[in-house]
From Swiss-Prot:
Gene: GCV2
Modified residues (N6-(pyridoxal phosphate)lysine): 773
Gene source species: Saccharomyces cerevisiae (strain ATCC 204508 / S288c)
Superkingdom to which the source organism belongs: Eukaryota
Anything else known: Present with 12000 molecules/cell in log phase SD medium.
Catalytic activity: N(6)-[(R)-lipoyl]-L-lysyl-[glycine-cleavage complex H protein] + glycine + H(+) = N(6)-[(R)-S(8)-aminomethyldihydrolipoyl]-L-lysyl-[glycine-cleavage complex H protein] + CO2
One GO cellular component term: mitochondrion
Function: The glycine cleavage system (glycine decarboxylase complex) catalyzes the degradation of glycine. The P protein binds the alpha-amino group of glycine through its pyridoxal phosphate cofactor; CO(2) is released and the remaining methylamine moiety is then transferred to the lipoamide cofactor of the H protein.
Protein name: Glycine dehydrogenase (decarboxylating), mitochondrial
EC number: 1.4.4.2
Length: 1034
């Protein structure tokens, strides 16, 4: 009871210290919660864990398919053993020792779910009821960057719905990622072929953010001297909005011109202060700029070394001349229509391609071709020194997670259809669009076709006094069709691969066109205008010609996934990544048509299911974080950071404090923090950490005081990036508040807080959440992600809006920042995953995700501390526990020739993905097991690490066996075909089967250790053509 009273008083103190930032109503509400803590603190005892874990067999009404025992790895008896190993008898006592008393709040959660959570079948029934409230059977011809697609079932079942694909991590360990790397290389090849540019990345977040990256790349190439950027009037509106958001922090002036008025456009582009121009091709109204106009735009920009960027459509580019033909420097867009569902706006893989001289400036990850230790061709992520985890605030972009899973879907769609199949789809779309266009241009039709060129989109000025509202109403009520209202008397529509002749017949009826049969009998599939038609052969690599039968495609996908290590194989103990279970029940709804077939610009009354789900999820996340408001629009962690900082800046500007532009960031922070701050127009000032890993509060106070007039914010990860619960966090927050700054608490490590404490309880102003970490969205091999930002009440008016549709949850006003993503709710299709996870764990179960995550981490640390040095948690430290992750220090062995990367590679021979390598401290490994791993798996990993320590000792002692580390990993080919085993100093058995469990279940690295230097020095990031392969063979 005394402990609870102290906690309540500390909560009150926190609120009083933040009165300038929290409304009086919020303070009263918080006080009532603090009083509640005296009698209703969250129960995290071992007895409660047994109740949560075990089904209730006494009550016949209670379901047996409860979720917590499926999600949480250790059984109650395992928990007892683990606690005993560490000297504890109860989970509650363990947590009270681990989390500082001023941090441990244990405020009861108020989730909109049964206290013990839904069981699995209840969850599916509940979600189906919600999903059926969406109008998913309506035929959407809205377009504007989102289209109906047909996802081949062989790809849906064997890739999108396969845990071997969606539970893997970003392929930073290439020896166990060759399958995904090949699929991503296919994606890059598709993009490079269709755009005509030599270098493409492995995806970005969406078309709008890709456009923002193009603008900033153009700006940076000008050395930030050219402050004007030109955009075509006929750009998608959501892209314009994102561009305005990205431009503001750099004082870039966006100039909108009508590029179809080529003389006027060229005059504007000749201004030497213009860094670049972005054109939509085909345009949002469906029109296509003539070749000579595109060339004039390019020439005008190149005359003063500025860049032409083109936002394009990959499906259209199977027929259209590639933008590179006209001199484009950058081509970007969305690959969504290559089989990826609309999903109410995402996730979809954006693409980004550049000319050769920009290959080291391109944002995002690039897959390149290299070779391994044995000289075998292999794939890896290339040019990593560009990325934010290395360059920090000097990085080309803050992009981290992208859309790898969806890029793999899109590339597989292209592999399955091949070049002829893709062009047949495109010709059919064009033919059906032409039927409708010619009917509207007929003399008997009262309406006027605005665009005289097209691929799939038509814009129509309505006649006979008909309003857009009337026509849209008629289309929906009589034919179950959605169209797009451009203005009160103009509509547009876009056809896609799902469109049939019956659909076109209904559209003719919508426009009151008689004698439809005479138009429907026409075939325009071979009538694509010659002036626009590409003449080169596309997708020449053999991979796009070999797998067109379902059997061949099934085997190809299986062959790729068998080369990759995922959670289906073993634990992925990556620190700061939280590779927890992505349960089957959570994943099932994402391919339901009720969720996947929804266009993001459908009227709000047609998406009531999404509205109900989003509203409830937002309330739950606010309860978990202790905040008042939320935006689900950011679609990656880096995007969430950027959005939170932009919201802070908007709030400060509204108070007349535009001059506040300094962001304090600890030196231990993840590289996305300083990169995001720089993108938000903030000056990064580093704050030191002490030798024990904690934030240097004296340095923080000095820096805050030094920059008191310019201080905008501090970005702090909690628990810290070192995996520590620092007791001084509230003091740090008070320091920043006292000098007028806002506090951004990075939610990357939220998996250690849920139900125990929260950013809001600690006094922060804003945080982002990684839904792909704490809330069970899969990593997908590098995306998708979700990163809502949660804020205190004073920041709610500044949350991002959307320019095309109203936000169904009511956010958006005069103070709102412009969109940060193309879609109003970002990657909306994956939100049911987090929704289901929270609802199934329930108020009582969810805190145990954090409790067991920390139990697993500390158990592993206890087992390993006698064999390795543990950074910051040792006999020299006041901290005796880590949070949910810990750092193994290998730096002492470097002088003897052992690097952390040697241990990382050797773990592959034991069947494990390496922990986080060289971050946050070079020469270390950061380990995070998550709550989903059982005791058997934890012990297996610890046994592997202990065995590797013996190998380290051998190398340090100069014994030949120690070379096993330097040669790791060992592929099956190496073991069978290499002829130098007599001189290696160790046996094949020692290389492949160092521990007994590997004889029962062995995952083989596909290739030997890669040559990173060779890969960067000889950059190849597309599949070679058939001719190139033939030449190599000769």
């Amino acid at each position: 009871m005394l402990r609870t009273r102290v906690t309540a008083l500390l909560c009150r103190a926190t609120v009083r210290s933040s009165t300038n930032y929290v409304s009086l109503a919020r303070t009263r509400s918080f006080h009532s919660q603090s009083i509640l803590l005296k009698t209703a603190a969250t129960d995290i005892t071992s007895t409660q864990y047994s109740r949560i874990f075990n089904p209730d067999l006494k009550n016949i009404d209670r379901p047996l398919d409860t979720f917590a025992r499926r999600h949480l790895g250790p059984s109650p008896s395992d928990v007892k053993k683990m606690l005993k190993t560490m000297g504890y008898s109860d989970l509650n006592a363990f947590i009270e020792e681990l989390v500082p008393p001023n941090i441990l709040k244990r405020r009861p959660l108020k989730l909109e779910a049964p206290s013990k959570g839904f069981c699995e079948q209840e969850m599916l029934q509940h979600l189906e009821k919600i999903a059926n409230k969406n109008h998913y059977k309506v035929k959407n011809f809205i377009g504007k960057g989102y289209y109906g697609t047909i996802l081949p079932p062989v790809i849906q079942r064997n890739l999108l719905e396969s845990p071997e694909w969606y539970t893997s991590y970003t392929p930073y360990q290439p020896e166990i990622s060759q399958g995904r790397l090949e699929a991503l290389l296919n994606f890059q090849t598709v993009v490079s072929d269709l755009t005509g540019l030599p270098v493409a990345n492995a995806s970005l977040l969406d078309e709008g953010t890709a456009a923002g990256e193009a603008m900033l790349l153009s700006f940076n190439i000008s050395r930030k001297k050219k402050l004007k950027y030109v955009i075509d009037k006929k750009l998608h509106q959501q892209t314009k909005s994102v561009l305005h958001t990205r431009a503001k922090p750099f004082n870039i002036e966006i100039i909108e011109v009508d590029c179809s008025d080529i003389k006027k456009a060229v005059d504007v582009l000749k201004n030497p202060d213009v860094s670049g121009c972005l054109v939509q091709y085909p345009a949002t109204d469906g029109s296509i700029l003539p070749p000579d106009s595109m060339k004039q735009l390019s020439d005008a920009l190149h005359s003063h070394k500025s860049l032409l960027s083109v936002a394009s459509d990959l499906m259209a580019l199977t027929l259209l001349k590639p933008p590179a033909h006209y001199g484009a420097d950058i081509v970007l867009g969305s690959s969504q229509r290559f089989g990826v569902p609309m999903g109410y706006g995402g996730p979809h893989a954006a693409f980004f391609a550049v000319i050769d001289k920009l290959n080291r400036k391109i944002p995002g990850r690039i897959v390149g071709i290299s070779k391994d230790r044995l000289g075998k061709t292999a794939l890896r992520l290339a040019l990593q020194t560009r990325e934010q985890h290395i360059k920090r605030d000097k990085a080309t972009s803050n992009i981290c997670t992208a859309q790898a899973l969806l890029a793999n879907v899109a590339s597989s769609y292209c592999v399955y259809h091949g070049p002829k199949g893709l062009q047949n789809i495109s010709r059919r779309i064009f033919s059906l669009t032409s039927i409708l266009a010619n009917a509207i241009e007929n003399d008997s039709c009262p309406h006027e076709l605005i665009n005289k060129t097209w691929f799939d989109t038509l814009t129509i000025k309505l006649g006979n006094g008909i309003s857009s509202e009337q026509l849209l109403d008629k289309a929906l009520k009589e034919f179950n069709i959605n169209l797009f209202a451009v203005d009160t008397t103009t509509i547009s529509l876009a056809l896609d691969e799902t469109t049939t002749k019956a659909d076109v017949e209904n559209l003719l009826k919508v426009f009151d066109i008689e004698n439809s049969s005479q138009f429907l009998s026409e075939d325009y599939s071979n009538s694509f205008p010659r002036e626009f038609q590409r003449t080169d052969e596309i997708l020449r690599n053999e991979v796009f010609h070999m797998h067109h039968s379902e059997t061949a495609m099934l085997r190809y996908l299986h062959r790729l996934q068998s080369r990759d290590l995922s959670l289906a194989n073993s634990m992925i103990p990556l620190g700061s990544c939280t590779m927890k279970l992505n349960s089957t029940v959570e994943m099932m709804p994402i391919t339901w048509p009720q969720f996947s077939n929804i266009h993001p610009f459908q009227p709000s009354n047609q998406v009531q299911g999404y509205k109900e789900l989003i509203t409830s999820l937002e309330k739950d996340l606010c309860s978990i974080t202790g905040f008042d408001g939320i935006s689900l629009q950011p679609n990656s962690g880096a995007q969430g950071e950027y959005t939170g900082l932009r919201v802070i800046r908007s709030y400060l500007e509204s108070k007349g404090e535009n001059h506040r532009n300094v962001c304090l960031i600890p030196v231990s922070a993840h590289g996305t923090n300083p990169a995001s701050a720089a993108m938000a127009g903030l000056k990064v000032v580093p704050v030191n950490c002490l030798q024990d890993g904690s934030l240097d509060l004296v340095d923080l106070k000095n820096k805050a005081e030094q920059h008191s007039k310019e201080l905008a914010a501090v970005m702090i990860t909690y628990p810290s990036t070192y995996g520590l619960f620092e007791p001084g966090i509230q003091h740090a927050i008070d320091i920043v508040h006292s000098f007028g700054g806002q506090v951004y608490l990075d939610g990357a490590n939220m998996n250690a807080q849920v139900g125990l404490t929260s950013p809001g309880d600690l006094g922060a102003d804003v945080c982002h959440l990684n839904l792909h970490k704490t809330f069970s969205i899969p990593h997908g091999g590098g995306g998708p992600a979700g990163a809502p930002i949660c804020v205190k009440s004073h920041l709610i008016p500044h949350l991002p809006k959307h320019d095309v549709v109203d936000m169904i949850t009511g956010i958006g006003g005069s103070k709102s920042i412009d969109s940060v993503s193309s879609a109003p709710y970002g990657n909306a299709l994956v939100l049911p995953i987090s929704y289901a996870y929270i609802k199934m764990m329930g108020n009582e179960g969810l805190p145990f995700s954090s409790v067991i995550a920390m139990l697993n981490s500390n158990y592993m640390m206890t087992r390993l501390k006698d064999h390795y040095k543990i950074l910051f948690v040792n006999e020299m430290s006041t901290l005796k526990h880590c949070a949910h992750e810990f750092i193994v220090d290998l730096r002492e062995y470097k002088a003897k020739g052992v690097e952390a990367i040697d241990v990382a590679k050797r773990l592959q021979d034991y069947g494990f993905h390496a922990p986080t390598l060289a971050f946050p401290v070079p020469g270390t490994l950061m380990i995070e097991p998550t709550e989903s791993e059982n005791l058997e798996e934890l012990d297996r990993f610890c046994d592997a690490m202990i065995s590797i320590k013996e190998e380290i000792n051998a190398l340090v002692a100069g014994q030949p066996k120690g070379q096993i580390l330097k040669n790791a990993p060992h592929s099956l080919e190496d073991l069978i075909t290499s002829s130098n085993w007599d001189t290696r100093g160790y046996t094949r058995e020692e290389a492949a089967y160092p521990l007994p469990f590997l004889r029962y279940n062995k995952f083989w690295p596909t290739v030997a250790r890669l040559d990173d230097t060779y890969g960067d020095m000889n950059l190849i990031c597309t599949c070679p053509s058939v001719e190139e392969i033939a030449n190599e063979t000769e």
